[in-house]
Amino acid sequence: ADDPIRYWRDKQGREMDFVLSRGRDVVHAIECKWSADALDGSALKAFRALYPKGQNYLVTPSANEAYQIRKSDMDITVCDLGSLLGLL
């Protein structure tokens, strides 16, 4: 069976748009923004403090092709929705 797509939010109000469990202790984090510049990284950093294993994705319509950025000491794959489906 496929693992469900979930949402994550902590008591401080930081949230991840989507989280996907992929095996034992591996959770992919997915944020959706209009542009890569809109990501501040604080929610992702808080999420990764609790769930350190997994890939980080930023989905934006402005990404013509997938590329990597580093923010808040984390590697993040920036891509559009079509590319994300291929990466997962």
What is each model feature region?
Residues A1-L88:
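A cross-kingdom feature that marks ATP-driven nucleic-acid transaction machinery
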